[in-house]
Curated annotation (Swiss-Prot):
Fourteen ClpP subunits assemble into 2 heptameric rings which stack back to back to give a disk-like structure with a central cavity, resembling the structure of eukaryotic proteasomes. This is ATP-dependent Clp protease proteolytic subunit. Coiled coil: none annotated. It is found in: Cytoplasm. GO terms for biological process: protein quality control for misfolded or incompletely synthesized proteins. It holds the Pfam family CLP_protease. The active site is at residues 98, 123. Keywords: Cytoplasm, Hydrolase, Protease, Serine protease. Belongs to the peptidase S14 family. The gene is clpP. Its main location: cytoplasm.
Amino acid sequence: MALVPMVIEQTNRGERAYDIYSRLLRDNIIFLGTPIDDQIANLVIAQLLFLSAEDPDKDIQLYINSPGGSITAGLAIYDTMQFIKNDVVTYCIGQAASMGAFLLMSGTAGKRFALPNSRILIHQPSMGGLSGQATDIDIHAREILRIREITNNLMSKHTGQSLERIERDVERDFIMNAPQAKEYGIIDEIIDRPRV
């Protein structure tokens, strides 16, 4: 079980304790600091929808330090980011790998950032551990190809890179530092101080 820090605030009624994630949420900040699975995706989606309902015109900040994870869970977060009216400002702190990098580049254009020592990794989708009958494996292989086409097209759209370059670069792990990610179009700026 992970340790979640508590924040104590003084109010005119006394003290109030929050877990750190709830306190960040009050400032329109969502922190994605784990592998992405269905449970984490549901939490991030719920936070995006909540913040959008609270104020559809206020930027939502999504801080990412994730090794990636489930394609379907990540695409659910992606679709929600595109669905809500708010601009979603993305930040890479540490690493944004695989689906983490996909979400980083999917932030609002002009509002995608990385800290100087960030590591960004893109690659093609995979669904490891396939076994079973040949027909089932064939079904899953076709699904992987379908999802690869979707994610490659979306990466091309968000980075400005040609589809051919994306297809070539994601064939194997493609690792970038922050300046390389900026040049590639995954982020817009490298920052070392909070934006005001």
